[in-house]
Amino acid sequence: MISRVLVAALVALPALVTATPAPGKPKASSQCDVGEIHCCDTQQTPDHTSAAASGLLGVPINLGAFLGFDCTPISVLGVGGNNCAAQPVCCTGNQFTALINALDCSPVNVNL
């Protein structure tokens, strides 16, 4: 019985070793995984009132996330003279409605 378990373990070990993903490169602090980096004139955390109002607009809001208002995409390289006087942000949900430009935003450290 022990020999069967030992043989099974020896057969399974190479399969586990080859299936393990290699660690990737660490990401730069200025990288935005979900798209472009935006410059938002105003950022705020939603409260229950704005979250309820957003439901009426059809825009789901996470109460723990930042909202971005009056946002424009910026280039990480600063090509074309793009700069951001406010804090650059990376947003997971770019829903451009009449009131809210970006959802679930987090600040990004970018030297523009």
Curated annotation (Swiss-Prot):
Self-assembles to form functional amyloid fibrils called rodlets. Self-assembly into fibrillar rodlets occurs spontaneously at hydrophobic:hydrophilic interfaces and the rodlets further associate laterally to form amphipathic monolayers. Its main location: secreted. Expressed in tissue fractions consisting of undifferentiated white hyphae. Not expressed in the outermost cell layers of the pileipellis but in the cell layers adjacent to that. Disulfide bonds join C32-C90, C39-C84, C40-C71, C91-C105. The keyword Zinc does not apply. One of its GO terms (molecular function) is structural constituent of cell wall. Aerial growth, conidiation, and dispersal of filamentous fungi in the environment rely upon a capability of their secreting small amphipathic proteins called hydrophobins (HPBs) with low sequence identity. Class I can self-assemble into an outermost layer of rodlet bundles on aerial cell surfaces, conferring cellular hydrophobicity that supports fungal growth, development and dispersal; whereas Class II form highly ordered films at water-air interfaces through intermolecular interactions but contribute nothing to the rodlet structure. It is found in: Secreted; Secreted, Cell wall. Induction: Expression is transiently increased ten days after fruit body induction and appears to be associated with rapid expansion of the mushroom caps. Residues 1-19 form the signal peptide. This is Class I hydrophobin A. It comes from the Eukaryota. It comes from Agaricus bisporus. It holds the Pfam family Hydrophobin. InterPro entries: Hydrophobin, Hydrophobin_CS.
